[in-house]
């Protein structure tokens, strides 16, 4: 090939600038897609990463919105009532308040009065907590030290 045939090709400097621009656009596009994906994942998991709240931490907003949350505390002694075949009502208490819980289903073997419990559910329109899942705890190892100390101070955990 003679030197005349290379005149029709763009200069190497121009090619490297063009490639650099394309790479930059590709990196920016990937970062944008990753940011959107992360945002969608966080948005989708906003209700699944919920810790429990004690009855005194429940707000009016929690009651009015009807969103799923976890209610944690101690099953108040003398409040467990079996209504019908599978329906159970009981109160979950902490040092300040108590909440009535209605649960339809089988209770775990570790469920007992005076024992720690976490109930996953929601508040209905009447402000009654409807439990969908009961997690009974054999001791306070599943809760933070501060919460365990707070509950021990006001109730006898077995």
Swiss-Prot record:
InterPro entries: CcmE, CcmE-like_sf, NA-bd_OB-fold
Stretches of the chain found on the membrane's Periplasmic side: 45-158
Membrane topology (Cytoplasmic): 1-23
Compartments reported by the entry: Cell inner membrane
Main location: membrane
Signal peptide (UniProt feature, chain positions): none
Presence of the UniProt keyword Glycoprotein in the record: no
Family listed: Belongs to the CcmE/CycJ family.
Protein name: Cytochrome c-type biogenesis protein CcmE
Gene: ccmE
């Amino acid at each position: 090939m003679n030197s005349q045939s290379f005149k029709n090709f763009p200069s190497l400097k121009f090619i490297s600038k063009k490639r650099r621009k394309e790479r930059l656009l590709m990196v920016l596009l990937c970062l944008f897609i990753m940011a959107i994906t992360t945002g969608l994942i966080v948005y989708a998991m906003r209700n699944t990463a919920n810790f429990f709240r004690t009855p005194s931490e429940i707000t009016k907003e929690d009651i009015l919105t009807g969103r799923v949350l976890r209610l944690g505390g101690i099953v108040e002694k003398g409040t467990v009532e079996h209504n019908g075949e599978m329906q159970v009502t009981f109160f979950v208490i902490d040092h300040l308040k108590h909440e009535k819980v209605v649960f339809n289903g089988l209770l775990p073997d570790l469920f007992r009065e005076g024992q720690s419990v976490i109930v996953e559910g929601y508040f209905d329109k009447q402000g009654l907590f409807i439990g969908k899942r009961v997690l009974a705890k054999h001791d306070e190892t599943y809760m933070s030290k501060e919460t365990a100390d707070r509950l021990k101070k006001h109730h006898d955990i077995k």
